[in-house]
Amino acid sequence: VTNHCLICDRIKLIQENKNPYFVRELSTGYVVLGDSQYFEGYTLFLSKHHVTELHQLAPAEKLAFLEEMSLVQEACAKAFHADKMNIELLGNGDAHVHWHLFPRHNGDTAQPGPVWWTPMDVMFGDDVIKDMPRLNRLKAALGAALDEVLKVRATDDGVKKLNQGD
């Protein structure tokens, strides 16, 4: 772990309105599309707090972060019509808690398996990274799906409160 954090740098760009991959701010983190869209809809959910492990978050924040990640995952699945979602919390390269969310489709790799079996030069090719019209279309799709998921969540919470007599 070094004093320099690439995720913190990305968050700073979001706060300065300079991150073209930014989709939405939630209470515990930031939703961004991945630099590479080889797996269309590849999304990250970045913790607002710089911790290197999930268990280092305060208990209430940890639960909220996990719940919001689940909502982002649901929106990502809806927006990109995923057959299956792959979700990972790694941090070996960037030691700042963040989720990788990959919408997967039948036949999207030569053999069924993790996205990391795809050669890095293919997965992170320049032609994939710099396609801004495509990126903007994907951001709009994910933003609309987040609106839908968050609206349902707010309605569900309201129903729960009514049922509890609050």
Indicate residue ranges for each PLM-predicted region:
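HIT superfamily nucleotide-processing domains
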Residues: 1-166
